[in-house]
Amino acid sequence: MPTREIRHPLIRHKLGLMRRADISTKNFRELAQEVGALLTYEATKDLPLETYDIEGWAGTVQVEKIAGKKITVVPILRAGIGMLEGVLSLIPGAKVSAVGVARNEETLQAHTYLEKLVPEINERLAMIIDPMLATGSSMVATIDLLKKAGCKDIRAMVLVAAPEGIAAVEKAHPDVQIYTASIDERLNEHGYIIPGLGDAGDKIFGTKQKDA
């Protein structure tokens, strides 16, 4: 599926603030949550609905709800946690499945070190969240893991994506829809997105940077 770049004015504005070199941990963390929520709105626009009856103030009324099992949100640790609160603000009943993936800084390849999936995940929509889609190795490894667990409907939400990472995911998993706030220019020789956001994990958790 072609990657969907969500160019909503609010997303563009907030992402611009996130690109500042001197942004504080507090502001970066809050903006990651806000953009995560806005991406969630777009990524769930086609969810199926079903009708049911309730007793309203003036009698029985027919209303709608999302059909099927609850969604599971899958943050890729550790940086994916930074988007989790924003996603859950819109889908508070979602289950959370955590996947830990580490990238070798020399080979840029990923390996999985943690897997905590919710029950009946094969019947749920799995929404992967990670601020950065750089080489794509972490995302591909996570999708591999979810498909092995039986997931059939998988979507990915990232704040910023590199063309190289998009190509890697689309080649390995062409059935997975990617939603991103921005498709950036390229990767540098160290596997970082240009212009990107810097190290999103460090900025979310306040490591290796000065707090304002």
Swiss-Prot record:
How cofactor binds (record note)? Answer: Binds 1 Mg(2+) ion per subunit. The magnesium is bound as Mg-PRPP.
Could you tell me the EC number(s) of this protein?
2.4.2.9
Q: How is its activity regulated?
A: Allosterically activated by GTP.
> By its UniProt entry, which InterPro entries does this protein fall under?
PRibTrfase_dom (IPR000836), PRTase-like (IPR029057), Upp_B (IPR034332), UPRTase/APRTase (IPR050054), Ura_phspho_trans (IPR005765)
Do you know which Gene3D superfamilies this protein is assigned to? 3.40.50.2020
Positions contributing to 5-phospho-alpha-D-ribose 1-diphosphate binding: 78, 103, 130-138, 199
**Protein's GO biological process:** UMP salvage; uracil salvage
Q: The organism sits in which domain of life?
A: Bacteria
Asked if the record carries the keyword GTP-binding, the reply is yes
Q: What class of enzyme is it?
A: transferase
Identify its protein family.
Belongs to the UPRTase family.
Stated role:
Catalyzes the conversion of uracil and 5-phospho-alpha-D-ribose 1-diphosphate (PRPP) to UMP and diphosphate.
- The protein depicted here goes by the name Uracil phosphoribosyltransferase
Instruction: Give me the gene this protein comes from.
Output: upp
